[in-house]
Regions:
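Sec-dependent signal peptide recognition
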Residues: 2-8
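Repetitive helical segments and hydrophobic/amphipathic motifs
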Residues: 11-12
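Sec/Tat signal peptide C-region and signal peptidase I cleavage site
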Residues: 16-20
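Sequence context surrounding c-type heme c attachment/ligation sites in exported
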Residues: 21-148
Length: 148
Protein backbone atom coordinates (compact mmCIF):
# COMPACT_ATOMS: atom_id res chain seq x y z
CA UNK A 1 0.00 0.00 0.00
CA UNK A 2 2.80 2.35 0.92
CA UNK A 3 4.44 1.71 -2.47
CA UNK A 4 1.21 2.62 -4.31
CA UNK A 5 0.96 5.90 -2.42
CA UNK A 6 4.60 6.75 -3.21
CA UNK A 7 4.16 5.94 -6.91
CA UNK A 8 0.92 7.94 -7.07
CA UNK A 9 2.62 10.91 -5.40
CA UNK A 10 5.53 10.75 -7.86
CA UNK A 11 3.14 10.65 -10.81
CA UNK A 12 1.20 13.61 -9.45
CA UNK A 13 4.40 15.61 -9.01
CA UNK A 14 5.54 14.73 -12.53
CA UNK A 15 2.20 15.78 -13.99
CA UNK A 16 2.40 19.05 -12.06
CA UNK A 17 5.86 19.75 -13.47
CA UNK A 18 4.66 19.11 -17.03
CA UNK A 19 1.72 21.48 -16.53
CA UNK A 20 4.06 24.14 -15.09
CA UNK A 21 6.41 23.74 -18.07
CA UNK A 22 3.51 24.04 -20.52
CA UNK A 23 2.35 27.19 -18.72
CA UNK A 24 5.87 28.61 -19.08
CA UNK A 25 5.77 27.87 -22.82
CA UNK A 26 2.40 29.63 -23.13
CA UNK A 27 3.73 32.68 -21.26
CA UNK A 28 6.75 32.78 -23.55
CA UNK A 29 4.57 32.53 -26.65
CA UNK A 30 2.26 35.29 -25.41
CA UNK A 31 5.23 37.57 -24.66
CA UNK A 32 6.78 37.00 -28.07
CA UNK A 33 3.47 37.40 -29.94
CA UNK A 34 2.81 40.73 -28.22
CA UNK A 35 6.34 41.87 -29.04
CA UNK A 36 5.86 40.82 -32.66
CA UNK A 37 2.54 42.65 -32.86
CA UNK A 38 4.23 45.85 -31.69
CA UNK A 39 7.12 45.36 -34.12
CA UNK A 40 4.59 44.92 -36.92
CA UNK A 41 2.86 48.18 -36.01
CA UNK A 42 6.17 50.04 -36.12
CA UNK A 43 7.17 48.38 -39.40
CA UNK A 44 3.85 49.48 -40.92
CA UNK A 45 4.63 53.08 -39.94
CA UNK A 46 8.12 52.86 -41.44
CA UNK A 47 6.69 51.47 -44.70
CA UNK A 48 4.04 54.19 -44.83
CA UNK A 49 1.20 51.70 -44.45
CA UNK A 50 0.03 53.41 -41.24
CA UNK A 51 0.39 57.00 -40.09
CA UNK A 52 3.07 57.82 -37.55
CA UNK A 53 1.73 57.49 -34.00
CA UNK A 54 4.07 58.52 -31.18
CA UNK A 55 1.88 56.89 -28.52
CA UNK A 56 2.02 53.57 -30.37
CA UNK A 57 5.80 53.88 -30.79
CA UNK A 58 6.26 54.63 -27.09
CA UNK A 59 4.00 51.71 -26.12
CA UNK A 60 5.93 49.39 -28.42
CA UNK A 61 9.25 50.44 -26.94
CA UNK A 62 7.90 49.81 -23.44
CA UNK A 63 6.84 46.33 -24.58
CA UNK A 64 10.26 45.70 -26.12
CA UNK A 65 11.87 46.78 -22.84
CA UNK A 66 9.57 44.44 -20.91
CA UNK A 67 10.50 41.59 -23.23
CA UNK A 68 14.21 42.36 -22.83
CA UNK A 69 13.83 42.12 -19.05
CA UNK A 70 11.85 38.87 -19.20
CA UNK A 71 13.82 37.05 -21.92
CA UNK A 72 16.42 35.57 -19.56
CA UNK A 73 13.66 33.70 -17.70
CA UNK A 74 11.47 32.69 -20.65
CA UNK A 75 13.46 29.62 -21.70
CA UNK A 76 14.23 27.57 -18.56
CA UNK A 77 16.01 24.24 -18.90
CA UNK A 78 12.77 22.51 -17.92
CA UNK A 79 11.13 23.68 -21.17
CA UNK A 80 13.84 22.17 -23.41
CA UNK A 81 12.35 19.74 -25.90
CA UNK A 82 8.73 20.74 -25.37
CA UNK A 83 6.79 21.09 -28.60
CA UNK A 84 4.57 24.15 -28.26
CA UNK A 85 1.54 24.86 -30.39
CA UNK A 86 2.01 27.52 -33.03
CA UNK A 87 4.21 28.18 -36.03
CA UNK A 88 7.53 28.48 -34.17
CA UNK A 89 9.47 26.77 -31.43
CA UNK A 90 12.78 27.44 -29.75
CA UNK A 91 15.74 25.77 -31.42
CA UNK A 92 17.72 23.33 -29.26
CA UNK A 93 20.57 25.82 -29.63
CA UNK A 94 18.82 28.01 -27.00
CA UNK A 95 20.03 25.50 -24.40
CA UNK A 96 23.07 24.11 -26.22
CA UNK A 97 24.61 27.57 -26.71
CA UNK A 98 23.31 29.26 -23.57
CA UNK A 99 26.17 31.80 -23.53
CA UNK A 100 25.49 32.82 -27.13
CA UNK A 101 21.76 33.06 -26.46
CA UNK A 102 22.37 35.22 -23.40
CA UNK A 103 24.66 37.44 -25.48
CA UNK A 104 21.86 37.94 -28.02
CA UNK A 105 19.50 38.85 -25.17
CA UNK A 106 22.02 41.40 -23.84
CA UNK A 107 22.47 42.88 -27.33
CA UNK A 108 18.70 43.15 -27.75
CA UNK A 109 18.33 44.83 -24.35
CA UNK A 110 21.08 47.31 -25.26
CA UNK A 111 19.44 48.07 -28.62
CA UNK A 112 16.12 48.74 -26.86
CA UNK A 113 17.80 51.02 -24.32
CA UNK A 114 19.69 52.84 -27.08
CA UNK A 115 16.48 53.39 -29.06
CA UNK A 116 14.14 54.34 -26.22
CA UNK A 117 13.75 58.09 -25.94
CA UNK A 118 15.36 58.82 -29.32
CA UNK A 119 12.30 58.32 -31.51
CA UNK A 120 10.43 61.61 -31.84
CA UNK A 121 9.03 61.49 -35.37
CA UNK A 122 8.91 59.34 -38.50
CA UNK A 123 12.44 60.27 -39.55
CA UNK A 124 13.97 59.24 -36.22
CA UNK A 125 11.81 56.10 -36.22
CA UNK A 126 13.25 55.14 -39.62
CA UNK A 127 16.77 55.84 -38.38
CA UNK A 128 16.58 54.19 -34.96
CA UNK A 129 14.51 51.04 -35.49
CA UNK A 130 16.59 49.06 -38.02
CA UNK A 131 19.39 48.25 -35.53
CA UNK A 132 16.78 47.09 -33.01
CA UNK A 133 14.94 44.97 -35.58
CA UNK A 134 18.29 43.52 -36.65
CA UNK A 135 18.78 42.25 -33.10
CA UNK A 136 15.37 40.55 -33.21
CA UNK A 137 16.07 38.93 -36.57
CA UNK A 138 19.56 37.81 -35.63
CA UNK A 139 18.30 35.94 -32.61
CA UNK A 140 15.37 34.43 -34.53
CA UNK A 141 17.66 33.15 -37.29
CA UNK A 142 19.78 31.24 -34.80
CA UNK A 143 17.48 30.35 -31.92
CA UNK A 144 14.00 29.91 -33.44
CA UNK A 145 12.63 27.14 -35.65
CA UNK A 146 9.70 27.45 -38.03
CA UNK A 147 7.48 24.40 -37.91
CA UNK A 148 6.49 22.49 -40.99
Amino acid sequence: MKRIVVVAAMLALSAGAVVADQNQVKQTQAQMKETGKNAGAIAAMIKGEKPYDQAAVDAALVKFEDTAKKLPTLFPDSSKGLKPDGDYSPAPKVWEDKAGFEQHIASYAKAVADTKGKVKDLDTLKAEMPPLFKQCGGCHETYRLKKG
